[in-house]
Amino acid sequence: MPYARILGTGSYLPDTILTNTELAKRVETTDEWIVSRTGIQERRLAAEGQLTSDLAYRAALRAIEAAGIEAASIEMIIVATTTPDMVFPSTAVVVQERLGLAGVPAFDVQAVCAGFMYAFATANAFIRSGQIKRALVIGAETLSRLIDWDDRRTCILFGDGAGAVVLGADEDTGILSTELRADGRYKDILKCDARPSQGVLAGNPFVYMDGQAVFKFAVKALADIAEVTLAKAGKTKADLDWLVPHQANLRIIEATARHLALPMDKVVVTLPNHANTSAASVPLALDAAVRDGRIRRGELLLLEGIGGGFAWGSALLHY
């Protein structure tokens, strides 16, 4: 049975940067207040008319180039997003068309900030089962369009961006284990319950979050799933080289690192400059650390994501 291994990574960030200082001109907040509570210093915003598929496509091109393959060899496209271009069809088919891959299976996965981990595990299962040999997995969001810019509790948190990986079959190593979980009992602590109905938008069109409840849930859930993911692969905390976590809040990241007994210089943190990009955050962070040389071939990585639903997931892999 083949492994699924990361052949290449890629990412894309929109040009517009919104700093905390600039944000403080819109709502009652300060740079110091935001940094002390979240670790975020700035975030990227998609331009007017720039869609999630535009970000996803650019990240995909960079991942394909890094993998050193022809796009035509890709046999599946999965896009994790909460902010699709439209209700339907999927954002994945838009990316598929732009890549010129007619006929290749393409679909979206919606698990909010855990979306990339769900898409990653799905692609891994297809490769492990021998159904395909290569998959393009993308996390892309324009979450800034779901934000109430008058609500300082949420407008400080989110940014736009996309990250992608190409997975390929490998006989020697790759993804060692994955774990996915969800608990709908906590669906109301982080949500955006808007929905189209008879030509109008019903429900609240903006993100709502109970910050303290989310923090409490996330810290325990991420610690627990890390233990399970390591155990499934016969590994321990001491074996880990890197943690690549969802970039939501620095205190959550630090709590996970402490649980894993990892120093922070072995944790990939892009939160200060990216903010929370939801499904894009894990592949964005991974690509940043691969491209700057921190993460090297053969190292053992733990990837983790968690978001509304509640849904969370992880993967242990040799890069």
From Swiss-Prot:
GO terms for cellular component: cytoplasm. Pfam families: ACP_syn_III, ACP_syn_III_C. Gene3D superfamilies: 3.40.47.10. It is found in: Cytoplasm. It catalyses: malonyl-[ACP] + acetyl-CoA + H(+) = 3-oxobutanoyl-[ACP] + CO2 + CoA. One of its GO terms (molecular function) is beta-ketoacyl-acyl-carrier-protein synthase III activity. Residues 247-251 are annotated as: ACP-binding. Coiled coil: none annotated. The active site is at C113, H246, N276. Transmembrane segments: none annotated. Its EC number is 2.3.1.180. InterPro entries: ACP_syn_III_C, ACP_syn_III_N, FabH, Thiolase-like. Pathway: Lipid metabolism; fatty acid biosynthesis. Belongs to the thiolase-like superfamily. FabH family. Homodimer. This is Beta-ketoacyl-[acyl-carrier-protein] synthase III. It comes from Laribacter hongkongensis (strain HLHK9). The gene is fabH.
